Amino acid sequence: MNEGEILFQFTTWLIFLISYLIGSIPFGLLLTKLAKLGDVRTIGSGNIGATNVLRTGNKKVAALTLLCDILKGTLVILVIKFLTDPIENNIFISLAGFFAFLGHLFPVWLKFKGGKGVATYLGVCLGLYWPAAIVFITAWIVLFLITRYSSLSALIAVIITPIFVHFSYPYLYAHCILVIMSLLVMIKHHANIGRLLVGKESKIGTQNGGK
């Protein structure tokens, strides 16, 4: 391996590390503390995501948490797209988004106990291939309006989105990474799935349990 290849490998992994660290920023925890709403990990499901932040009763902080968690996935990809050829480096761009997603799920700052990845998943879709984000949002909204279950809406959305990408986006690497991300979201929702199956999952607006 020559000097140029070593530098390339170092730069690549450095970018992946930075992407992971950006994804690891626990906005739900930070914003609730800044708003003096307490530790979101002691509220509802104990999750640091926007749905659980909403259970504090502060819709503005919940919305800001959602936006920040989405942007973690989007900005990482858009910056790299701006600096490189988005077609030639599609796998590199996809992996950077994946590392940001992993950071949200397993943040080093919180002993690797993070969120469930739904918002950052959406952010990666938005940065990588915006029509996928539209499909995700549409699926989530339709399911939520029907069921009022945030968790179920997210689970259906992460199933539909990779299927859409498979038939509409030409880059296999991105599709494979999106499938892995969908599986991780499902794994993170294992408790929600259990509650859904026995009819004990809480809907948006309740104060306990849920996503």
Swiss-Prot record:
Catalytic reactions of this protein: an acyl phosphate + sn-glycerol 3-phosphate = a 1-acyl-sn-glycero-3-phosphate + phosphate
Entry's transmembrane regions: 10-30, 63-83, 90-110, 126-146, 152-172
SMART domains cross-referenced by the UniProt entry: G3P_acyltransf
Enzyme Commission designation: 2.3.1.275
Entry-linked InterPro entries: G3P_acylTferase_PlsY (IPR003811)
Keywords assigned: Cell inner membrane, Cell membrane, Lipid biosynthesis, Lipid metabolism, Membrane, Phospholipid biosynthesis, Phospholipid metabolism, Transferase, Transmembrane, Transmembrane helix
Annotated membrane topology: Multi-pass membrane protein
Compartments, as annotated in UniProt: Cell inner membrane
Primary localisation category: membrane
Signal peptide positions (record): none
Name of the protein this chain belongs to: Glycerol-3-phosphate acyltransferase
Enzyme class, first EC level, given as a word: transferase
Task performed by this protein: Catalyzes the transfer of an acyl group from acyl-phosphate (acyl-PO(4)) to glycerol-3-phosphate (G3P) to form lysophosphatidic acid (LPA). This enzyme utilizes acyl-phosphate as fatty acyl donor, but not acyl-CoA or acyl-ACP.
Family membership noted in the UniProt record: Belongs to the PlsY family.
Quaternary organization: Probably interacts with PlsX.
Molecular function as annotated in GO: acyl-phosphate glycerol-3-phosphate acyltransferase activity
One BP annotation, GO: phospholipid biosynthetic process
Pathway participation: Lipid metabolism; phospholipid metabolism
Gene Ontology CC: one annotated term: plasma membrane
